[in-house]
Structure formats: structure tokens, C-alpha cells
Curated annotation (Swiss-Prot):
Active site: D11, D130
Keyword entries, A-Z: Amino-acid biosynthesis, Cytoplasm, Histidine biosynthesis, Lyase
Cellular compartments per GO CC: cytoplasm
Location of this chain's protein in the cell: Cytoplasm
Family, as annotated: Belongs to the HisA/HisF family.
Entries under NCBIfam families matching the protein: hisF (TIGR00735)
GO function term, MF aspect, one: imidazoleglycerol-phosphate synthase activity
Function: IGPS catalyzes the conversion of PRFAR and glutamine to IGP, AICAR and glutamate. The HisF subunit catalyzes the cyclization activity that produces IGP and AICAR from PRFAR using the ammonia provided by the HisH subunit.
Oligomeric and partner information: Heterodimer of HisH and HisF.
Taxonomic lineage of the native organism: Bacteria, Pseudomonadati, Pseudomonadota, Alphaproteobacteria, Rhodobacterales
Entry EC no(s): 4.3.2.10
HAMAP family, alphabetized: HisF (MF_01013)
Gene3D superfamilies xref list: Aldolase class I
Protein known as: Imidazole glycerol phosphate synthase subunit HisF
Length: 253
């Protein structure tokens, strides 16, 4: 049985790790290179690096910072933010990323995901979906760092991305982001059930039980968290031990 991955996320703005609530009210959480080194030593399964202002500011990802972060990581590194073309994917892979995440660009031009998957393989192409509840059982995608409504149904879009060659979905509930109230489990379950590829649950972790629920109730293949790890509330080791005790297969450090 595949092991469930625990993935800390570095949301990076102006060269610093930040953490917000509902995509705003950002709080400084440290240096990304130092954070990468610490998470690698702590036994994280992967690391997610998101340049959260790149698309909104209409610029590319911070390649130098990605390279310096990757140099500290022996675990797989997923990088997103400002990724628009297959050339961007190539540049990030060369900078040290193991996987590259499309977000706003995949909504604007779904074909870019297929092109990147054809060139580099589905295994390194992630599509990040930022979704907000708009009605019971219905979730809409927002782009540009959560600033722009699209009118696109999140479940249908996830299915399209899987069919176009995405290897993984990084699913963030905007309603739950930074709230510490737990994952949006109906959203996570709906998309996990709808697509044949792994889903990373993101947005809302405040306790170790929330990580367990993302897998047992949400059906996620991996769970992502930020603030519970960044501010020292729990360690990666504690999270893995808690999940293992709940019967979830994890790679123990």
C-alpha cells in the first residue's frame, strides 16, 4: 500500500515564508532556505514551495530562491507560482524542482498542462486548485492568488486536468485556509472520488486529527500543512506517529 505523504508548504512572498488566513493577513514565518533544511532533517516526505504573488504581480517564479531551497532538500520539491508555459516548467526543473505546479495558467489555457505533461511526464506536473464553496456541494475555482472568481466548477476542472495529463491535484479550500478548522472534507472527498490521480489536501489544518481526517474521510493521498509546523506547534515526527497510530501507512523517519 502506498504511504500517505505529509507535506509542509512554504508560501513565499518577498523572499520570506508567510502564512495567512483565507489567503490574506500574511504573517512572517521565516527564511525559506532555513525552513527547507529543517523540514528535510525532520523527515518530511515532500516540500511544497509556492511563490504566492508571482501570478498577481505578473512575473516569473524566484528561480534563485528555488535553487537555494532545492540545495537543502533531499526530499522531493514541488514549486508553483507564476508558472505559465512549458519553458517555465523546464527552467524550474533545471533550478532543482522535482515537480512543477500550474494554477492560474491551467485555468486560462488547459492545453498548457497537456503540453507540459507530454514533454516532461505526468509524474512532475501538478495542478493546484484553489476552491471556494459557492453552494452546498458546489465549489468554484479562484485564480490569481484567490483574487479572481472564474465561475468554473472545481470537480469538473479536476477531472479535465487529470484527463489532460496532470499527475497530481493540489487542492486548497480557500474557506478553510489558515482557519485551523480542518480540511473541507466534502470538497476533498468529491475530488478524490472523481479523479484517478493523487489528491493533496490543503487548507485548514489545526490539529493532528485533521491530518488523519483528510485521509480517512477526505480520501486524500497526501496532506499538506503550514502553520502547525512553521510555528513549532507540532513536528513532522509527531504528525507521522499520530497518523500511524490511526492506522494510516506513513514513512516513519
Amino acid at each position: 500500500m502506498l504511504k500517505t505523504r505529509i507535506i509542509p508548504c512554504l508560501d513565499v512572498a518577498d523572499g520570506r515564508v508567510v502564512k495567512g488566513v483565507n489567503f490574506v493577513d500574511l504573517r512572517d514565518a521565516g527564511d525559506p532556505v532555513e525552513a527547507a533544511r529543517a523540514y528535510d532533517a525532520a523527515g518530511a516526505d515532500e516540500l511544497c514551495f509556492l511563490d504566492i504573488h508571482a501570478t498577481h504581480e505578473n512575473r516569473g517564479t524566484m528561480y534563485d530562491l528555488v535553487t537555494r531551497t532545492a540545495e537543502q532538500c533531499f526530499m522531493p520539491l514541488t514549486v508553483g507560482g507564476g508558472v505559465r508555459t512549458h519553458q517555465d516548467v523546464r527552467a524550474l526543473l533545471l533550478a532543482g524542482a522535482d515537480k512543477v505546479s500550474f494554477n492560474s495558467a491551467a485555468v486560462a489555457d488547459p492545453g498548457v498542462v497537456a503540453e507540459a505533461a507530454d514533454r516532461f511526464g505526468s509524474q512532475c506536473i501538478v495542478v493546484a486548485i484553489d476552491a471556494k464553496t459557492v453552494a452546498p456541494g458546489r465549489w468554484e475555482i479562484f485564480t490569481h492568488g484567490g483574487r479572481r472568481a472564474t465561475g468554473i466548477d472545481a470537480v469538473a476542472f479536476a477531472c479535465e486536468m487529470a484527463s489532460r495529463g496532470a499527475g497530481e491535484i493540489l487542492l486548497t479550500s480557500m474557506d478553510r485556509d489558515g482557519t485551523r478548522a480542518g480540511f473541507n472534507l466534502p470538497l476533498t472527498r468529491a475530488i478524490s472520488d472523481a479523479v484517478p490521480i493523487p489528491v493533496i489536501a490543503s487548507g485548514g489544518v489545526g490539529t493532528l486529527d485533521h491530518l488523519v481526517e483528510g485521509v480517512t474521510e477526505g480520501g486524500a493521498s497526501a496532506v499538506l500543512a503550514a502553520s502547525i509546523f512553521h510555528f513549532g506547534e507540532f513536528t513532522i515526527g509527531e504528525a507521522k506517529a499520530h497518523m500511524a497510530a490511526a492506522g494510516i501507512p506513513v514513512r516513519l523517519a
